[in-house]
Regions:
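Conserved donor-nucleotide binding/catalytic region of nucleotide-linked donor-dependent transferases
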Residues: 303, 308-337, 354
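A donor-sugar binding/catalytic signature common to diverse glycosyltransferases
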Residues: 15, 22-25, 250-292
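Nucleotide-activated donor-dependent transferases that construct or modify glycoconjugates
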Residues: 1-14
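C-terminal alpha-helical cap of glycosyltransferases
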Residues: 339-356
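Conserved nucleotide-sugar phosphate-binding/catalytic loop shared by glycosyltransferases and other
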Residues: 31-87, 306
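A nucleotide-sugar donor-handling region in carbohydrate enzymes
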Residues: 135-200
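Donor-nucleotide binding loops and adjacent catalytic segments primarily
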Residues: 184-258
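Nucleotide-sugar donor-binding patch of glycosyltransferase catalytic domains
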Residues: 278-314
């Protein structure tokens, strides 16, 4: 298969869409398919990072970033019309054969997909929102939404194959093996990560909370992403003796697996932690994570701090106090789930079957 993946990263979009597409891209390459990424040169893009990961990337023309005050105004994410974006993609692919177009972009819908489909390609839609129509051959949403099996019936053609639920989660290969070995070498630590861009400064809030506490019965490892705009402010703050501040841990999933507890978002990172059976406190770092966080918290397996736009350092101070009080009796492992780390293999299996 010759696969094109259309995905962006920016200070407003974040890095998560690109990171999960990289998982899919690497699995496709592992199966000896060709992969080309199409990504626009927005502020905070990951084009160079993707190339460092061995990817072939075509950079779409830079534009003047239009940053909406509403982080969830998804149409602003694209920067151009869907028709212009599709035409630029097709022009960039003039000498690149392709039979699959994968896209992971909240600003793209059936209008863009239909223009790409006219080229004879299969369309693979990655979505989390279920808020617009798709003209796709395969629809993917790995979130464990309530009633996830019926979520897209009104938005996709009847002929579209739907890969729904966390068993299809696009996780790096290491999660499958770490899931089996997590019972070994658990460290007395809490690890925290709030996305690559951390738009509402959750890492800074948690660090400020730690500064108000004389001691904790565990270490706190604060991991901030490569695109965190508050890096300078984080580095200026004095660190309590029980805090470690780290930028973009290269072996993050290993450190995650060896931690006893975590703070983090309710998107892909929550699926990663569930795969590892790691207890955690959730924060909705994007509006589309709110429903998911509330749903997971109702299960009784997770604690939910709230929406990141509303959280303060005091929220984290209270949560750390609660953890300290219950630290000795907290379970260090969640019950089994169907998130086994093999989702990327299942996704590529489906693409190969649809191509045969």
């Amino acid at each position: 298969m010759n696969v094109v993946i259309r995905v962006d990263a920016s200070n407003q979009i974040g890095t998560g869409h690109v990171m999960r597409c990289l998982v899919l891209a690497k699995k496709l390459l592992e199966r000896h398919h060709t992969v080309t990424l199409l990504s626009r040169e927005l502020t905070g893009n990951l084009i160079d990072y993707c190339r460092q990961q061995g990817m072939t990337v075509i950079a779409l023309p830079a534009i003047e970033d239009v940053v909406s005050p509403d982080r969830n105004d998804y149409q602003h994410w694209l920067g151009v019309s869907q028709e212009e974006d599709a035409n630029q993609c097709l022009a960039a692919l003039k000498n690149t054969p392709f039979d699959w177009v994968v896209f992971d972009h909240y600003a793209l819908d059936t209008q863009w997909q239909s223009l790409m489909k006219c080229q004879g390609a299969n369309i693979f839609a990655i979505d989390d929102l279920a808020n617009r129509e798709h003209n796709c051959d395969i629809l993917f949403d790995h979130n464990p939404w309530p009633d996830f099996k019926n979520r897209y019936h009104a938005f996709v053609p009847a002929s579209s194959q739907q890969l729904l639920g966390p068993k299809f989660a696009l996780l790096r290969d290491s999660f499958a093996s770490l899931r089996e070995t997590r019972k070994e070498d658990i460290k007395n630590q809490v690890i925290a990560f709030f996305s690559g861009t951390d738009p509402t400064g959750e890492c800074l809030k948690l660090l400020s909370a730690c500064q108000q506490i004389p001691s904790l019965p565990f270490r706190v490892v604060l991991v901030y992403g490569m695109s965190n705009p508050r890096e300078a402010e984080l580095l200026e703050k004095p660190l309590p003796a029980f805090v470690t501040l780290v930028k973009s841990l290269p072996d993050f999933e290993t450190e995650l697996a060896h931690s006893r507890y975590a703070f983090g978002g309710a998107g892909v990172s929550a699926i990663e932690r569930t795969c590892l059976r790691l207890p955690s406190t959730l924060v909705s770092v994007a509006e589309n994570q709110r429903e998911m966080a509330e749903h997971l918290a109702k299960s009784g397996l997770y604690r939910y701090l709230g929406v990141s736009d509303a959280t303060t350092a005091a929220y984290y101070t209270n949560e750390l106090a609660w953890l300290s009080e219950h630290w000795e009796t907290l379970p260090w492992r969640l019950p089994e789930s169907d998130i086994d780390g093999e989702g990327a293999n299942r996704v590529v299996d489906a693409m190969e079957a649809a191509s045969s």
